[in-house]
């Protein structure tokens, strides 16, 4: 027994040492980002570091928060401290037995316990106060406090963070707003529980999610016998004949992070009934220990009874004495007395089995899990803005209903979330702007064109430089700040117009001077080469006739005869043949002198002077010298030619709408196709792309007979017949060792026996001292119980099994006045008398039998599992722990237990199986699974439909139009289409784009499928397919392109609206991202490209737009032109012609 006590002391020391390792802990409160006017409470909890049992009486929960805190945290609460200890008359060498220890009861006061008075949480929302309290889980030497914070939901608005204190430990309370509008964050989705569920309601209209439940006992003195809650438990367990159940009260429970209080028992609330049933089955709670004690051991000393309160004459409470890691709450209330008696039992697990009549208690706090039906909040798309900032860009993302998923391959997203009114705001930085910014937000792919950001920054800079004339500077900046050749041509055009009369003569002068220099250098180089060649030839001729040209004394090779003669006279006499200065007549001395002599080229220079000097020829050089670059005729002619050329370049370099969908098209031809043979299109199309094909089919025998042909193919929709497998759960694996010296293993109830998923192996009646502590009574007694179980279960995702798959597209054709539409799938066709459209096949990564896992909203995408267990699941497999409407499905633990023994030491259990849940193993190898994204999902009880936004799938399409079309019947089209423009928003240019609203009328027929385009006078910038019905139709066209002078009109075929509207300039300081899937379309109508005529028309429209726009800009440009002409006249005056005198 002494060794046993020594072990307890060492355990207490170890627990105390943990206290100093961490002095600040975090208690997180999750709030919805929209706080309504209804009632509601938020709750948070945190486990603190162990504290010694002796210091518990001095604990006081302090707060620096600006809450209206209930006074219970400072109120003294009388409790009975019930402990166990070795009997005083037990000898040191005595063996452990049921008679060697005893219980002890004392009275003391504790402050801040979770003893909540009545009406504190029941009152109206405006009168509710914040409750801060703590619970205790203790062994004989130390306690683990658990701090609870229950606050009205409006504190989410008034509080960001504050501090709580318990003893020497500090708790940082952090209010964190989730992206949920009003629901709770479960499985990455925003879940709103349904308080009342109609059984007749279709099952696919709600979902069932398991969320944690925290309950607090509230004693209440009343004459209502229905509040004898122990009687309720006994009734559920069909226990009768018990009379000691007089305590009256109820539990107030909270679901998840925020909820209304639920009062248990309440028979008309199905949630309260379920919680009451779970309490009866798991009286200690469904969460069995702290997160840090998943692998632990404890030793049972034995059963004992005691007095509560200590003044009782007989025992009123019983339990099991233990040592080791604490498991459950050590605070209870006595069930037998009507007046509440609170018990604190460190090192004792009180009796809470409701099938026992006497000496039982109720836990002061209870934690469990509750499956609840409810709905998932709908999500909205994100709006993303970006601005240039330094070398990168600052971006903001907004969403009305919260941002549940945001990522970017080009930006740094720190996940720090803020809320702006009813919207969620996330700010992030993009370091590079040389590539377009790509952001995935709420299941949508957004792209921000960085060149539009550069345009905005250019306009801002230009306007800032010329801030004295902001209106004029801004209008000019809008025209100049265009990227690419188009922008440079605009700058060149305006510079030529304003300053051409100065720039042309200046540039001409510089060019002429450079050409003169080159002409002179080329001529000079030619003269030097000829001179060197002449000297070489003279030397060669002298060598042929006279012999060597090398001096015999200094060995210097001479180039001419006079130089050799001077060497022969001077070198033998010790004189330099060039400067005639005396030196030694040796080769080394003469050669050293030649290196410093400055007259070694004297003979070459004399020969050069004797030749005639070079005179430049009178051809190119003279022409350049006398060129009249200052002539008004020359400058004016060049000025006009440059303006015309620059206008053509400006128009030709304008951006056109580019198609970037990765599709392959084998169709060729113009807008009008003579139908000499069958018209066939055979192409592959990405799943997210739409395809529009329009042509006029011409009769080759009669060119006047034409049939309009329109073909539209919608984006692919994936239809999956599914089986809802339920919710995948994650849990904590626990390995426990329970040991006692005497008695069979069935003598005690172990904690894992009330867990939903557990496995136990008992090693009963040890046969030797090798597995018995020294203070045990002997061999052949006692038990080592090994158990593994799962707790802290939480839902992590929804799981669906694919039964069958179907890939469909909506196809429509309009041939003359005949219209036909059909939804086709793989190996299906739309067939008419003249047209056949087939989807031949689909390349897909989905297969029947796959399992789809969604770890958040459907829009966040999912993971494809090729193998998913549904029948015999092992712990660690995908699908190991499942929550289904039929209940919890537990996995099998395939490992084996091993009892680790040492002589005279308490044994411990080891487990050689897997200890990681399937969810944790999946996270560790997530990159090995295929993932997919979803857009526009629609789910029912047995089907799931969605669109693939990534274009990861492709369809093979084949279209054939028979050449035997009846031109006589179809060429006469009675349908009359009229177009008019209604409104426009957005900006011209190739960045942000614009939205043109058209009013289209249809007469003479009931319906007509055609395309409406957005065009200016020169070309078109966007189109859409419209299925018109008789009367007025509103059509929206998204386009990109144009210029400041573009008046965008609504056009059908060659007819356009009589008026057009101008779009705004692309100078917004914030650029909005666009959805890639909205722009993922192919439009092919065979219209010709913009040619020379189109270029001049576009240039004229642009000039007219400038003239009709800000007239001050035109005035400034004209003033600059006049000023440049005036300066030209001053600098280049007219040449005076002198007449000859007669």
UniProtKB/Swiss-Prot annotation:
Keywords: Disulfide bond, Fusion of virus membrane with host endosomal membrane, Fusion of virus membrane with host membrane, Glycoprotein, Host endoplasmic reticulum, Host Golgi apparatus, Host membrane, Host mitochondrion, Host-virus interaction, Inhibition of host innate immune response by virus, Inhibition of host RLR pathway by virus, Inhibition of host TRAFs by virus, Membrane, Metal-binding, Phosphoprotein, Repeat, Signal, Transmembrane, Transmembrane helix, Viral attachment to host cell, Viral immunoevasion, Viral penetration into host cytoplasm, Virion, Virus entry into host cell, Zinc, Zinc-finger
Start and end residues of each stretch annotated as Fusion loop: 763-783
Signal peptide: 1-21
Stretches in topological domain Cytoplasmic: 511-633, 1132-1142
Record protein name field: Envelopment polyprotein
Species whose genome carries this gene: Prospect Hill virus (PHV)
ITAM domain mapped to chain residues: 617-640
PROSITE patterns from the UniProt entry: ITAM_2
Chain ranges of zinc fingers (CCHC-type): 551-571, 576-597
Keyword Repeat assigned: yes
Record-level GO BP terms: fusion of virus membrane with host endosome membrane; signal transduction; symbiont entry into host cell; symbiont-mediated suppression of host innate immune response; symbiont-mediated suppression of host TRAF-mediated signal transduction; virion attachment to host cell
TM regions (residue ranges): 490-510, 634-654, 1111-1131
Residue intervals on the Lumenal side: 22-489, 655-1110
Motif (YxxL): 621-624
GO molecular function: zinc ion binding
Domain of life: Viruses
UniProt keyword Oxidoreductase present: no
Family from the record: Belongs to the hantavirus envelope glycoprotein family.
Gene Ontology CC terms, in alphabetical order: host cell endoplasmic reticulum membrane; host cell Golgi membrane; host cell mitochondrion; host cell surface; membrane; virion membrane
Disulfide bonds: 31-156, 65-162, 114-133, 138-143, 180-190, 215-253, 382-441, 386-395, 411-430, 458-481, 741-776, 745-783, 757-890, 771-901, 786-909, 812-821, 829-838, 869-873, 975-1005, 998-1050, 1015-1020, 1051-1056, 1090-1094
Glycosylation site positions: 139, 353, 405, 933
Other facts: This virus is non-pathogenic.
Residue ranges of the region described as Binding to the ribonucleoprotein: 522-539, 594-611, 598-609, 617-631, 1127-1142
Site (Cleavage): 654-655
InterPro entries: Envelope_glycoprot_Hantavirus (IPR016402), Gc_C_bunya (IPR048791), Gn-B_hanta (IPR048790), Hanta_Gc_N (IPR002532), Hanta_Gn-H (IPR002534), ITAM_motif_hantavir-typ (IPR012316)
